[in-house]
UniProtKB/Swiss-Prot annotation:
GO terms for cellular component: plasma membrane. It is a peripheral membrane protein. The lineage of its organism: Bacteria, Pseudomonadati, Pseudomonadota, Gammaproteobacteria, Enterobacterales. This is Elongation factor 4. It holds the Pfam family GTP_EFTU. Coiled coil: none annotated. The gene is lepA. CDD domains: EF4_II, EF4_III, LepA, lepA_C.
């Protein structure tokens, strides 16, 4: 056991985590050169296309160190994006140490800090690594000072390497073996294994990634899931070298995969503890804290026949992604679907794309909203995650919106622009600290503004230099109203949005104008209105298409023309009473862009 090292790689987006993982795999001979490819751990097509890591992946490698010993390295490559920080915290729970990778050109960024603090809270040994020293812009001295100033860990002798060229990667491994402690645990005690992650395989059922904390797990053992008290047979187990390799046992301190023919997707939830059925452990390991979704949106299949397969797909996906929340929802405009909760807009986009690709579905998404806390006049507190669930205005005593605490790190040159943006987003400054030429800003901004397009706008006002980390702080009373959209005097529930009263006029007008462009013209006039309660705040009309009924008249008497026009008018009137308007998919997506800059 003293030769096992479990560690994660944490860093800001694009600081080179996945490339460093590639080099480590190559040096330790996990894959032959023929099988090696760039970003070997980003196994999803989506991850490769966007160049980001979404799912944490684990690998077991053997490394022969300079002291002649062979060490077993279990390492987990983690995502860097703010929306996937729960993946990082889950990976860290399985480790004793973390490699903090910092780009020697960019320096410390917000996510570097957030992930590093998560690791320190879990009492992990953090080893700083300066990556990308082959770049002409690299300044390792300055960045080492920055790490000490901002993060507060000693970086004077931080390892310098270039994952791209492979320089210094062996030093990283030597340092890691030296500084990261071996796992603690009792190899002879009762089995306790923590489920770090699980996914669904069509042939094997549920595959779980486990970290053995105490005891040993052998092939063929009877295994009990502590939360559900169900017992299963350990059919196959093994490690990833990135390929799946079968083993006969997993020893204390190791990380590996397990298949025990669980067909029910809720059979082995992430964060649960596995123990042996013969000699069970007394208590479960502390799991992970449940992450609360920040953004909710309705997802509906385009054709209602897909509802069943959509439900199965969501079930399989939620197994792999513990933070995805969903419940059935029906809408008069869109039929049956699900209300889903996500951690942020990127997470929402990724989930929608994975559903469409991996499960071949066509989906419509409604506008994302955050959760509001509503105190009714009957003094009840309810949580509303969809505009259609908001009680009528006269039943609301107080409406509170979620406030996010945003930590931003940016160069001084862009401070003015970023402050202007934060004020425009109804933000309140709580802290500002200068570190050299970097500024650390803390603002409290309403969550609804953050999830809409704050990240994109922050990047564009600071030319991509600012970085952001945010978390939920509290609920705060606010003057929010629901803007409804009426089409021919009928409310369309899927188009409603909740917004601040100050912005409601402009948002309503903008939405109505957008709808006017998107709804195709019909044989009758279509009135599109935005309303708060019964008060109409904006209106526009999609003009009817009409045939020229006078074309056949060639001159002739005016009363003859009047008769024809009158007849057409009555026909249109009758049509309007029975006609209904088909809304195109773009109309629902239009709300996503309301309130965004049309630059």
């Amino acid at each position: 056991m003293k030769n096992i090292r479990n560690f994660s790689i944490i860093a800001h987006i694009d600081h080179g985590k996945s490339t460093l993982s590639d080099r480590i795999i190559q040096i330790c001979g996990g894959l032959s050169d023929r099988e090696m490819e760039a970003q070997v751990l980003d196994s999803m097509d989506l991850e490769r296309e966007r160049g980001i890591t979404i799912k944490a992946q684990s690998v077991t490698l053997d490394f022969k160190a300079s002291d002649g010993e062979t060490y077993q390295l279990n390492f987990i490559d983690t995502p860097g994006h703010v929306d996937f920080s729960y993946e990082v915290s889950r990976s860290l729970a399985a480790c004793e140490g973390a490699l903090l990778v910092v780009d020697a050109g960019q320096g410390v960024e917000a996510q570097t800090l957030a992930n590093c603090y998560t690791a320190m809270e879990m009492d992990l040994e953090v080893v700083p690594v300066l990556n990308k020293i082959d770049l002409p812009a690299a300044d390792p001295e300055r960045v080492a000072e920055e790490i000490e100033d901002i993060v507060g860990i000693d970086a004077t002798d931080a390892v310098r390497c270039s994952a791209k060229t492979g320089v210094g990667v062996t030093d990283v491994l030597e340092r890691l073996v030296r500084d990261i402690p071996p796992p603690q645990g009792d190899p002879d005690g009762p089995l306790q294994a923590l489920i770090i992650d699980s996914w669904f395989d069509n042939y094997l059922g549920v595959v779980s990634l486990v970290r053995i904390k105490n005891g040993t797990m052998r092939k063929g053992d009877k295994i009990k899931v502590m939360s559900t008290r169900q017992t299963y047979n350990a059919d196959r187990l093994g490690i990833f070298t990135p390929k799946q390799v079968d083993r006969t046992e997993l020893k204390c301190g190791e990380v590996g995969w397990l298949v025990c023919a669980i067909k029910d997707i809720l059979g082995a939830p992430v964060g649960d503890t596995l123990t042996s059925a013969r000699n069970p452990a007394e208590k479960a390991l502390p799991g992970f804290k449940k992450v609360k979704p920040q953004v909710y949106a309705g997802l509906f299949p385009v054709s209602s026949d897909d509802y069943e397969s959509f439900r199965d797909a969501l079930g399989k996906l939620s197994l792999n992604d513990a933070s995805l929340f969903y419940e059935p929802e029906s809408s008069s405009a869109l039929g049956f679907g699900f209300r889903c909760g996500f951690l942020g807009l990127l997470h929402m986009e990724i989930i929608q794309e994975r559903l469409e690709r991996e499960y071949d579905l066509d989906l419509i998404t409604t506008a994302p909203t955050v959760v509001y806390e509503v105190e009714t006049t009957a003094k009840e507190t309810i949580y509303v995650d969809s505009p259609s669930k908001l009680p009528p205005l006269n039943n609301i005593y107080e409406l509170r919106e979620p406030i996010a605490e945003c930590h931003m790190l940016l160069p001084q040159a862009y401070l003015g622009n970023v402050i202007t943006l934060c004020i425009e987003k109804r933000g309140v400054q709580t802290n500002m600290v200068y570190h050299g030429n970097q500024v650390a800003l803390t603002y409290e901004i309403p969550m609804a503004e953050v999830v809409l397009d704050f990240f994109d706008r922050l990047k564009s006002t600071s030319r991509g230099y600012a970085s952001l980390d945010y978390n939920f702080k509290r609920f705060q009373a606010s003057d929010m109203v629901r803007v409804d959209v009426l089409i021919n005097n009928e409310r369309v529930d899927a188009l409603a949005l909740i917004t601040h009263r100050d912005n409601s006029q402009s948002r309503g007008r903008e939405l109505v104008e957008k709808m006017k462009d998107l709804i195709p013209r019909q044989q009758f006039d279509i009135a599109i209105q935005a309303a708060i309660g019964t008060h109409i705040i904006a209106r526009s009309t999609v003009k009817q298409l009409r045939k020229n009924v006078l074309a056949k008249c060639y001159g002739g008497d005016i009363s003859r023309k009047k008769k024809l026009l009158q007849k057409q008018k009555e026909g249109k009137k009758r049509m309007k009473q029975i006609g209904n308007v088909e809304l195109p998919q773009e109309a629902f997506l239009a709300i996503l862009h309301v309130g965004k800059d049309n630059k």
